[in-house]
Amino acid sequence: MYTGRFAPSPTGLLHIGSLLTAVASYADARSNGGKWLVRMEDLDPPREMPGAASHILHTLEAFGFKWDGEVTYQSRRYALYEETLYRLKTAGLVYPCHCNRKDWQAGARRGTDGFVYNGRCRHPGQRPALQGKQPSWRIRVPDRDIGFSDGIVGSYAQNLARDIGDFVLFRADGYWAYQLAVVADDAEQGVTHIVRGQDLLVSTPRQIYLQQCLGVPTPQYAHLPLLTNAQGQKWSKQTLAPALDLNRREQLLRQVFRYLKLPEAPETDRPAELLDWAVAHWDMDKVPKHAITAP
């Protein structure tokens, strides 16, 4: 059975880009007779906004979204992540990293998503002294392409050794890394389809590699075009995207429908009816492949 999900992070309130992702993932799930889960990705407490998680859920309800089952919170699933990391340790696929980020990045080259780790701690004899601090844990990556066929973008691949380097699964500050948590959650929740923004396209080969290492199924992916401001920057909390105005729900839904190339919906002041329209007329093939300027 199709199982999709929407997984916001409570580092801020939902904005127009969040709404586009929610509508697209919801419409794709419901039009395929599937389930739509909501997962709160609250992995990084220092970056979270107090009250954001409850506000996000209230906003989704106000826009007419109905999810299946209870909301999942990553902050309550550490035991699952510990078990997942233990499996990788047992298989000899991960190693402790004692490197200081500032030091190793000083001589590192840039890759597809930041600096490429130089692999110093891969070899026990080369690891620097820990100096009383707990290490991070990295996974060894292969020198080969990891690719997939995206439902919107098409073919996409990375050579993880060249483009990314051995990446962190557990941080030295004691927090779980996004890449491990999202793979563990998707597998445990039986997620079969992931519809999300193209800012996460670059993370997908890492997640597929982790799925392969753990022997869990790889979902089907579709990465949506990003909404950008007049300066070409992605609308986000960092670029001061305004929070969704609950007094303009109908207008905002229609705006997102236009971005997703849905036909004009009939007049109604009920957000749930507009979502039903989106489900009935959903066509992934019509979704644009490139960024959309959203004033």
Curated annotation (Swiss-Prot):
Entry EC no(s): 6.1.1.-
Coiled-coil segments: none
InterPro entries on file: Glu-Q_tRNA(Asp)_Synthase, Glu/Gln-tRNA-synth, Glu/Gln-tRNA-synth_Ib_cat-dom, GluQ/Sye, Rossmann-like_a/b/a_fold
Cofactor note as given: Binds 1 zinc ion per subunit.
GO molecular function: ATP binding; glutamate-tRNA ligase activity; zinc ion binding
One Gene Ontology term from the biological process aspect of the record: tRNA modification
UniProt motif ('KMSKS' region) ranges: 234-238
Residues engaged in binding L-glutamate: 5-9, 41, 178, 196
Placement of sequence motif 'HIGH' region: 8-18
Binding site for ATP: 237
Cofactor(s) annotated in UniProt: Zn(2+)
Binding site for Zn(2+): 97, 99, 117, 121
Keywords (A to Z) from UniProt: Aminoacyl-tRNA synthetase, ATP-binding, Ligase, Metal-binding, Nucleotide-binding, Zinc
Catalytic class of the enzyme: ligase
GO-annotated cellular components: cytosol
Assigned protein family: Belongs to the class-I aminoacyl-tRNA synthetase family. GluQ subfamily.
Role description: Catalyzes the tRNA-independent activation of glutamate in presence of ATP and the subsequent transfer of glutamate onto a tRNA(Asp). Glutamate is transferred on the 2-amino-5-(4,5-dihydroxy-2-cyclopenten-1-yl) moiety of the queuosine in the wobble position of the QUC anticodon.
Protein name in the entry: Glutamyl-Q tRNA(Asp) synthetase
Gene from which this protein is expressed: gluQ
